[in-house]
Amino acid sequence: MNHDPLNDVINTIKNASRIGKSEVIIGPASVMIGRILKVMQDYNYIKSFEVIEEERGGKFRVELSDTINNCGVIKPRLSVKNSNIERYESRYLPAQDFGIIILTTTKGIMSHIEARKLGIGGKLLAYVY
C-alpha cells in the first residue's frame, strides 16, 4: 500500500472547501506540508494555519477561505525545466494567470510564478485554482 500524505492533505482541503467548512484539521504535520500550506496562504487560498502539537508529530489547523475552486496532486512528480513550466500550466490550470502550480525546487517549495521569476525548474507537486 502506498501512502501519499500530500494527496491526503489536498483532498481534505478540497472536500472541506466543497461542503463549506471554514476550518479543517490535517495530520500528521510535516515540514513539507507546512511549506505547501504557506504557499497556499501567500496566494490567499487559505486564510491561516497553525501547528497543533501532539506526541505523535502534531497536526495542522487550517482556516479555509472561499477562493478554492479545485485543487489536486500532480502524479507522477514530473521534473520540469523553467522553459517547460508554461506547458504544465496550460495542462493543470483552467486559464492563464488563474491559479498556481506548487513545485519543489533547489530554492525550496514555491509557486510556478516565483519559479519562473527566478528562472528555475523543479518537480511538480500540486495545483490550486
UniProtKB/Swiss-Prot annotation:
Tell me where on the tree of life, at the top rank, the source sits: Archaea
The record's section on Pfam families has:
Ribosomal_S8 (PF00410)
Q: Which GO terms describe its cellular component?
A: ribonucleoprotein complex; ribosome
> Which keywords, in A-to-Z order, does the entry hold?
Ribonucleoprotein, Ribosomal protein, RNA-binding, rRNA-binding
Q: Which SUPFAM superfamilies match?
A: Ribosomal protein S8 (SSF56047)
User: Which GO BP annotation is one of this protein's?
Assistant: translation
Q: Hey, what's the signal peptide range on this chain?
A: none
InterPro entries in UniProt: Ribosomal_uS8, Ribosomal_uS8_CS, Ribosomal_uS8_sf
Could you tell me which Gene3D superfamilies the record lists for this protein? 3.30.1370.30, 3.30.1490.10
Q: A single GO molecular function, which one?
A: rRNA binding
What is known about its subunit structure? Part of the 30S ribosomal subunit.
Q: Which family does it belong to?
A: Belongs to the universal ribosomal protein uS8 family.
The name this protein goes by in its record: Small ribosomal subunit protein uS8
Source organism of this protein record:
Picrophilus torridus (strain ATCC 700027 / DSM 9790 / JCM 10055 / NBRC 100828 / KAW 2/3)
Gene name for this UniProt entry: rps8
